[in-house]
Amino acid sequence: MDFHLSKEHLLVRKMYREFAETEVKPLAEELDEEERFPMETVEKMGKLGMMGIYFPTEVGGAGGDVLSYVMAVEELSKVCGTTGVIVSAHTSLCAAPIYENGTPEQKAKYLPKLCSGEWLGAFGLTEPGAGTDAQGQQTFAKQDPETGDWILNGSKIFITNAGYANVFIVIAVTDIVPDKKGRPTKQCSAFIVERTDPGFSVGKAEDK
């Protein structure tokens, strides 16, 4: 097996490295000191195709591969951990679930905006009393029998990109059933929640 990068991947890495050095690194210290979210950098990365690297062009992506995506996150994280995590949470935890599991209508609605950087994505699992233990979470979802809409009730914490995200993948309990030993087990589902949905709000940023 050849572990050397292809010429194409070397060129891609060079492009990401130059972007990281010129556009991201100069802001890194300022972002940490001021606890500021680099929305201007997100917009630039969107124009460069970095917010949807390995998604096909048919859904608005750059048409690259996973290795190119990994190299992008690596180069960004070398100079600014904040920016690397912004891209990885947006891509792996929000855009990817929609691409892999969404309906054709959901893909058409969300992926072009996510891949272009017009919209930012986030993922909500962690809770105040449960951490990232899905079985311990207290966010529940119930379906309205008349409208068919799902109503979510609960709170999440430590959600990367939450302050600026337009769309969230939120994990909620939809049923409780016995396991093989008769113990109650929570069944969880992933929901697409938009920032503008009724009843949704984002709390103050944590002092980190």
Model-derived regions, located:
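Amphipathic, small/basic residue-rich leader segments at the start of a protein or domain
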Residues: 1-87, 106-109, 113-116, 143
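Conserved G/P- and acidic residue-centered "switch" motifs that form tight phosphate/ATP-binding loops
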Residues: 49, 103, 154
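Flexible, small-/acidic-enriched active-site or ligand-binding loops
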Residues: 136-138, 198-208
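N-terminal glycine-rich flavin-associated loop
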Residues: 85-105, 131-134, 143
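Short, solvent-exposed loop/turn elements at beta->coil junctions and helix N-caps
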Residues: 58, 125-130, 157-158, 205-208
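Cytochrome P450 C-terminal beta-domain/meander region
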Residues: 133-153
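A short, Trp-centered hydrophobic/proline-enriched beta-strand micro-motif
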Residues: 117-125
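A short core secondary-structure module
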Residues: 149-203
